[in-house]
Regions:
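A detector for small-residue-rich transmembrane helices and their helix-helix packing motifs
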Residues: 1-192
């Protein structure tokens, strides 16, 4: 029995079933905030300097910011990630899926604070990380996508509703693009 099984025995009752649905509802709410009250989006971002000054809601509210600002893209994102996320949850179980998503959220917050500390102690400046576009929720959707591709590599999806393509090839393209960004980007891109 590994540590995750032991943890599930102790904390499994606290798992949130259908977590993907709640994440996607959060994206839709965040999208609505972006278009109905655009000045409020600045209060949702993950900004370590402001969190350290007492705006602790930012530790959670950044998850509401959707990875896209286009309505059509949001609709397709919701449809695609609903099916991918629920399939992962059915495969792993609610508890393990929750651990996967929440550990990703936690490590993102830790990485952001690490990046903030790097800029603060190395250069003596407080860099507004969300303003320069380093912090977002794109990793959540991509981590779900890559996990699904790892578990179901031969599953075919219809790219643009026309071209059948296996998940492993889509994941490979994404990994190559992410690797290119990692090699050619600055420290902010590497941490993100």
């Amino acid at each position: 029995m590994n540590w995750l099984d032991k943890l599930e025995r102790k904390l499994g009752r606290f798992a949130i079933p259908n977590l993907t649905v709640y994440l996607l509802i959060g994206y839709v709410i965040g999208f609505g905030v972006m278009y109905l009250m655009p000045e409020m989006v600045g209060y949702l971002t993950l900004e370590p300097a402001l969190i350290l000054r007492g705006q602790v809601w930012r530790l959670i509210s950044w998850v509401l910011i959707p990875p896209t600002t286009n309505l059509i893209s949001l609709v397709f994102l919701v449809l695609l990630y609903y099916s991918l996320g629920t399939a992962l949850e059915r495969t792993w179980g609610s508890f393990r899926y929750n651990v996967y998503i929440f550990s990703g959220l936690l490590f993102t917050v830790l990485a952001v604070f690490g990046l903030y500390a790097f800029y603060y102690f190395r250069y003596g400046v407080e860099v507004p990380l969300s303003v320069i576009g380093l912090i977002g929720t794109n990793y959540i959707t991509m981590s779900i996508f890559l996990a699904f591709a790892a578990i179901y590599p031969n599953m075919e999806v219809m790219l643009y509703f026309i071209l059948p393509i296996k998940m492993k090839w889509m994941a490979l393209v994404y990994v190559v693009l992410a690797g290119y960004d990692f090699l050619n980007g600055g420290i902010g891109i590497r941490v993100a």
